[in-house]
Amino acid sequence: KMEGNSPEKEIDGSGVLPEDGAFDGSGEWVKLLTSDTENNKFESHVDGMSAEEVAIFTREAADKVGATKMDRPEDVEVSPVTDKVYVALTNNKYRGATGENAKKNQEDPTEYAPVKENKNGLVMEIEDDHAGEKFTWNLLLVCGDPKEANTYFGGFDKEKVSPISCPDNLAFDSH
């Protein structure tokens, strides 16, 4: 479950940075399933779902426990240098949608997904003890055309950034 650390009124769906200058916050890992593979035992932590159901229908299990809905996570990678986790969130054209698409709307824009009808995606950075119960996060990229106000490129000058859309896979080089 994730929360932003900026006042809700500063997140209006336009993608404009909040006053603190970053899309960031904290979160709490929610346990869905535990396993003891040596003894071939698995335990569900989701009421009304077996361990097998949690393993197969993970998104539904996460919804049942109130986990944060994300904008189509496509890849998760750990930096071999910093141990930070990076998540490519491809897009979600229905976030904050109105009219005919409102019924498909996952939820309104939030600090972890600050753009209405997010057509270009995001890249999130997660740090702290990944075996722990809590974490901190920030949006490294709010993708799109750098000429648009609703983009953010980790603090880099937008004039020096090419358009980025729908991040899919992440990789690290030796640098």
Tell where the protein language model's regions lie, with residue ranges.
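Sequence/structural signature of beta-propeller domains
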Residues: 1-175
